[in-house]
């Protein structure tokens, strides 16, 4: 038994809760619906790790203390092959002295962003309020403990998860008796509901002292972190991981094929899917929700579609729009025109204005191929991009680039093998995923030779 408490929210909650329960984790603040499905007890203690879906729904953000977070990530990487783990270089909710210039704030070699308040380059105290690929900063400084948060406005607030009127009244009265720094108030967290009053008083006193000390230290400090927050790691899910989570969820409740992929496609599709699965739960019908979405929204031949190329460091590279020349699920052919001159990276052949790129892709394939032609139709070469299984959405195709590639011109060669090895050393991907990518590259190279 790990005795690590995890709070899970978002579109992956049901499947991840089941997975983590089976791995021996303790689930905190579980929703009533999921508690009923899994028959797990309510636990209102403070979680060691917080999990919620990323802002783009293509994975999860995990936040917590180093040891608990590392154990959770090790379990996920051991059981799901195509995940990428990207640690943030700043700590979520951490307090920093920064140097602001037009909304871009130097936190000590790492940059965060906030609304530009003008006035040129100035030093200020900021907090990492959110991380969406980049740190988003706020000047509204909060101080968090296990049971209470000191908030930069007066008054007493209580977590909406504390429902009992007697508990709320008791916490409100307790808050009125406590002394906090000027212009600050108290927000009681859910875990305060079951904690003894003495412990709550001690935490408020401790946080108040730390807050006063921080404002004093800030004046003479250099740019950098003044108070730690929580470690933040973004975990990107590939297609295989979503399919495995579908399987876990389907063993609990009726789940449409490609449920988590569809959920990650946007709120409108997610809402329609919820209605569809309610019907699926009550009636015996053929499950083809994704086919209906394709028929209504695409992709469709002659339409434009985006190519979303996700790097292992989390950057999303938009390769531009391509025309769908052919589509019969799961096969698709795209065409793009080249503007500008130069040299094609990897192929080392001339790039000319007016060249045509023909991209052939199959959903769930571990590679995507780009074929290059001159304006007159002369073949120049092919670039086989090894990636996580490709996903089709109505307006885009998506995959995670696995660094290693195969190129074919007058000869066939594998490139960037060393770059993939470095990603394993950096712990962005597992050894197992790297081995899968290398095996696919070697298989393709042999077929093409």
Annotate each language-model stretch with its function.
Residues 152-154, 327-330, 374-377, 408-411:
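Short acidic-glycine loop/turn motifs at beta-strand connectors
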């Amino acid at each position: 038994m790990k005795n690590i408490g995890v709070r899970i929210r978002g579109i992956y909650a049901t499947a991840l809760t089941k997975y983590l329960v089976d791995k021996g984790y303790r689930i905190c603040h579980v929703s009533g619906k999921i508690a009923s499905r899994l028959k797990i007890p309510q636990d209102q203690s403070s979680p060691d790790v917080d999990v919620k879906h990323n802002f783009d729904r293509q994975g999860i953000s995990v936040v917590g203390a180093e040891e608990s977070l590392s154990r959770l990530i090790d379990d996920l990487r051991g059981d799901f092959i195509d995940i990428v783990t990207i640690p943030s270089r700043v700590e979520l909710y951490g307090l920093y002295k920064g140097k602001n210039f037009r909304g871009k704030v130097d936190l000590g070699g790492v940059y965060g962003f906030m609304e530009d308040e003008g006035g040129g380059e100035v030093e200020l105290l900021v907090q990492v309020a959110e991380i969406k690929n980049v740190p988003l900063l706020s000047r509204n400084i909060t101080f968090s403990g296990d049971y209470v948060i000191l908030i930069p406005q007066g008054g007493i607030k209580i977590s909406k998860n504390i429902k009992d009127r007697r508990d709320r009244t008791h916490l409100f009265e307790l808050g009125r008796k406590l002394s906090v720094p000027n212009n600050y108030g108290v927000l009681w967290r859910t875990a305060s509901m079951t904690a003894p009053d003495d412990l709550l008083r001690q935490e408020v006193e401790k946080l108040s002292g730390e807050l006063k000390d921080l404002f004093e230290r800030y004046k003479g400090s250099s740019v950098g972190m003044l108070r730690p927050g929580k470690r933040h790691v973004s975990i990107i899910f590939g297609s295989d991981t979503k399919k495995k989570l579908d399987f876990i969820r389907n063993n609990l409740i009726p789940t449409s094929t490609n449920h988590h992929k569809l959920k990650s496609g946007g709120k409108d599709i997610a809402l329609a899917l919820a209605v569809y699965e309610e019907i699926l739960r009550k009636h015996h019908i053929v499950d083809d929700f994704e086919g209906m979405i394709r028929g209504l929204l695409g992709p469709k031949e002659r339409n434009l579609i985006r190519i979303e190329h996700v790097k292992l460091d989390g950057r999303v590279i938009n390769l531009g729009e391509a025309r769908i020349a052919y589509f019969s699920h799961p096969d698709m052919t795209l065409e793009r025109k080249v503007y500008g001159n130069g040299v094609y990276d990897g192929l080392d052949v001339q790039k000319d204005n007016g060249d045509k790129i023909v991209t052939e892709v199959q959903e769930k394939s571990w590679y995507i191929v780009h074929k290059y032609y001159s304006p007159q139709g002369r073949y120049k070469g092919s670039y086989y991009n090894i990636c996580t299984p490709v996903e089709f959405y109505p307006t885009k195709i998506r995959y995670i680039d696995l660094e290693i590639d195969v190129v074919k011109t007058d000869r066939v060669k594998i490139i960037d093998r060393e770059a993939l090895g470095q990603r394993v050393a950096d712990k962005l991907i597992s050894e197992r995923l790297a081995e899968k990518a290398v095996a696919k590259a070697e298989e393709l190279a042999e077929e093409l030779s």
